[in-house]
Amino acid sequence: MSKVARRRKVEGVKPKITHGLPVRARLKCADNTGAKLLMIIGVHGYKGRKDRVPTASVGDMVTVVVKRGKYDLMHKPFKAIVVRQRMPYRRKNGQWVVFEDNAAVLVNDDGTPRGSEFRGPIAKEAIERWPSLSVISAQVV
């Protein structure tokens, strides 16, 4: 299979966004699963270099550990999608986007949300890349 054919199979095309969340960054949990504070322990699809810290941005799937929240969720790895980041990034139309906090939502392995509602605004880039998030999100920025 050629590289072009492989690119077409991707669920959503990822725009170039400034990476603002390295491994061990703390995120708010923006859904109602019972988790409050998350910590990134890995970035899915990151191909780096020796001794380089993997980083994530809006729309990336990351592996997280729940640091504060319900006891049955604590200290277990989950998959999450980053929906907000503090570091400014530029959209194709020239607009700069900045959020007040870093936030993610917990998802299953296939990218469907584990919670039934999202708190706060969700970045448009995350919705375009993961269409299953658009069903629950109330505010899209």
From Swiss-Prot:
Keywords: Ribonucleoprotein, Ribosomal protein, RNA-binding, rRNA-binding. The keyword Transmembrane does not apply. Signal peptide: none annotated. GO terms for molecular function: large ribosomal subunit rRNA binding; structural constituent of ribosome. SUPFAM superfamilies: Ribosomal protein L14 (SSF50193). InterPro entries: Ribosomal_uL14, Ribosomal_uL14_CS, Ribosomal_uL14_sf. CDD domains: Ribosomal_uL14 (cd00337). Binds to 23S rRNA. Forms part of two intersubunit bridges in the 70S ribosome. PANTHER family: 50S/60S RIBOSOMAL PROTEIN L14/L23, LARGE RIBOSOMAL SUBUNIT PROTEIN UL14. This is Large ribosomal subunit protein uL14. It comes from Korarchaeum cryptofilum (strain OPF8).
